[in-house]
From Swiss-Prot:
Coiled coil residues, start to end: none
Record's protein name: Large ribosomal subunit protein uL10
InterPro entries xrefs: Ribosomal_uL10, Ribosomal_uL10-like_sf, Ribosomal_uL10_bac, Ribosomal_uL10_bac_type, Ribosomal_uL10_CS_bac
Record GO biological process: translation
Family, per entry: Belongs to the universal ribosomal protein uL10 family.
Gene3D superfamilies in UniProt: 3.30.70.1730, 6.10.250.2350
Superkingdom as given in the UniProt entry: Bacteria
Lineage summary: Bacteria, Pseudomonadati, Pseudomonadota, Gammaproteobacteria, Pasteurellales
Length: 163
């Protein structure tokens, strides 16, 4: 079914709004993936705070114009599935990477974060906010415990020298 001008403008506006509010974007080619698998992916994406859409390349180029995802325009070839991460920068990359492992016909074309093309593996391994806080607390706790051990060792050595 051919889209009229108003429909095209609505799609461009909708994708542009999604791009402006997104933290990162991932582009993929979903040719050969069954409808059931794609429905499952869309459901998982909604739960993860990822918005997905299949968009014509010409409309997608116009939609990302002036956003930090304009760097992805070279990857807009063939059928294009774009996913925007709204809550965590690595959510879409992690979701697509896991889906690609189970579906060999699903091909990830590229990803963008902070206005630059990024490696999908880099984005997928970014820790969530809670994971980052846990790592930071572990590092602080480890450093404090290490300092306490060194202080006790120095005190023990000083007492042994005095005796």
């Amino acid at each position: 079914m051919a889209l009229n001008l108003q429909d095209k403008q609505a799609i461009v506006a909708e994708v542009n709004e999604a791009a402006k509010g997104a933290l990162s974007a991932v582009i993929a080619d979903s040719r050969g993936v069954t409808v059931d698998k794609m429905t499952e992916l869309r459901k998982t994406a909604r739960e993860a705070g990822v918005s997905m859409r299949v968009v014509r390349n010409t409309l997608l180029r116009r939609a990302v114009e002036g956003t930090e995802f304009e760097c992805l325009t070279d990857t807009f070839t063939g059928p294009t599935l774009i996913a925007f991460s709204n809550e965590h920068p690595g959510a879409a990359a992690r979701l697509f990477k896991e889906f690609a492992k189970a579906n060999d016909k699903f091909e990830i074309k590229g990803a963008a974060f902070e206005g630059k093309i990024q490696d999908v593996d880099f984005l997928a391994t970014l820790p969530t906010y809670d994971e980052a806080i846990a790592r930071l607390m572990g590092t602080i706790k480890e450093a404090a415990a290490g300092k306490l051990v060194r202080t006790f060792a120095a005190l023990r050595d000083k007492l042994q020298e005095a005796a």
